């Protein structure tokens, strides 16, 4: 085989892997979930928002960004570590990507001794689903009884 032929084979293999990864990601996004917009805080103005899908599974909410090619979730929120800090309406240039029906919730994830802040923008139905999932967590005072 000549060098150009080897280069073409490598290029075809790389493109094939990219298509497989993209297909897998799109398949994961189409499996369902709740539409949401999320960003890490602190953030400046209306910057940093990413559209995606939130999927709930047991004690974890996984956020898949629409524009990401990762095979795993972009953010994971543990139900035991998430605290709601505040709620607000969109403001300023956030209205470019949100409507007045959206509620922005500021969260703090204190899982594993790390303090990470997020903001999630959800419509009223998605907010109800998120709050129901969050409020159904076991009480921190609840202990498993050993026999």
From Swiss-Prot:
Species the sequence originates in: Mycobacterium tuberculosis (strain CDC 1551 / Oshkosh)
The organism's place on the tree of life at top rank: Bacteria
Topological category with respect to the lipid bilayer: Single-pass membrane protein
Family (UniProt): To M.leprae ML1147.
InterPro entries with a match to the protein in the record: DUF2550
Main localization, broad class: membrane
GO cellular component term, pick one: membrane
Name of this chain's protein: Uncharacterized protein MT1352
Keywords associated with the record: Membrane, Transmembrane, Transmembrane helix
Cell compartments where the protein resides: Membrane
Coiled coil stretches, renumbered: none
Entry's transmembrane regions: 3-23
Pfam families: DUF2550 (PF10739)
């Amino acid at each position: 085989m000549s060098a150009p032929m080897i280069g073409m084979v490598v290029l075809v293999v790389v493109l094939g892997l990219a298509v497989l990864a993209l297909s897998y990601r799109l398949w994961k996004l189409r499996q369902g979930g709740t539409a949401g917009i999320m960003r890490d805080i602190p953030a400046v103005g209306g910057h940093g928002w990413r559209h995606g899908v939130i999927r709930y599974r047991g004690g974890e909410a996984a956020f898949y960004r629409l524009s990401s090619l990762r095979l795993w979730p972009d953010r994971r929120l543990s139900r035991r570590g998430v605290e709601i800090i505040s709620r607000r309406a969109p403001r300023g240039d956030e209205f470019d990507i949100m409507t007045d029906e959206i509620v922005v919730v500021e969260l703090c994830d204190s899982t594993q001794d790390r303090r990470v802040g997020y903001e999630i923008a959800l419509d009223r139905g998605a907010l109800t689903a998120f709050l129901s999932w969050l409020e159904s967590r076991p009480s921190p005072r609840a202990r498993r009884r050993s026999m």
